[in-house]
Curated annotation (Swiss-Prot):
Record keywords, A-Z: ATP-binding, Coenzyme A biosynthesis, Cytoplasm, Magnesium, Nucleotide-binding, Nucleotidyltransferase, Transferase
Protein name (Swiss-Prot/TrEMBL): Phosphopantetheine adenylyltransferase
Cofactors that this protein relies on: Mg(2+)
Biological processes per GO annotation: coenzyme A biosynthetic process
Subunit structure: Homohexamer.
InterPro entries: Cyt_trans-like, PPAT, Rossmann-like_a/b/a_fold
Domain of life: Bacteria
EC number: 2.7.7.3
Length: 162
């Protein structure tokens, strides 16, 4: 079985993330969205909230893939992959600047555990999109409705209103 991990913090998941996950689901028998837990990073949503938002966004997606799982990832992504028999990592690239960092990570992951990384170019309509940018725009009252799944938009508005 060809299995891949799509790692990230997904705080929150964006339509750009969703696009990469759905496209990866067509290339692999199973895709595991690995929601990273970084105790040094302050997140808007807890890991459980992020995982549930991803599950709901996938269920609501018009091309709802049935071969995507969502799980929490502690520590190195290669350890996550190794413990689950995952051979590949899928990463979306928005710009050339992403490639420099991601190439180093891919080479390190391959040297540590023989895990291959597949780079997918981001759909041009999402090339500028990041979770950080979504949160910043939303905090200042900007409209992010076309940038995140509806379920995320609702939770984002509620969280920022607190």
């Amino acid at each position: 079985m060809r299995r891949a991990a799509c790692p990230g913090s997904f705080d929150p998941i964006t339509n750009g993330h969703l696009d990469i996950i759905v496209r990866a689901s067509r290339l692999f028998d199973e895709v595991v969205v690995a929601v990273s837990i970084n105790k040094n990073k302050v997140t808007l949503f807890t890991v459980d909230e992020r995982m549930e938002l991803i599950r709901e966004a996938l269920r609501d997606h018009p091309m709802a893939p049935s071969n995507v799982l969502v799980d929490a990832s502690h520590g190195l992504i290669v350890d996550f992959c190794r413990s689950r028999g995952i051979q590949s990592i899928v990463k979306g690239l928005r710009a050339v600047s992403d490639f420099d960092y991601e190439l180093q990570m891919a080479q390190m992951n391959n040297s540590l555990a023989g895990v291959e990384t597949l780079f997918m170019s981001t759909n041009p309509q999402y090339a500028f999109l990041s979770s950080s940018l979504v949160k910043e725009v939303a905090r200042y009252g900007g409209d992010v409705s076309g940038l995140v799944p509806d379920v995320v938009l609702k939770q984002l508005r509620e969280r920022l209103a607190q």
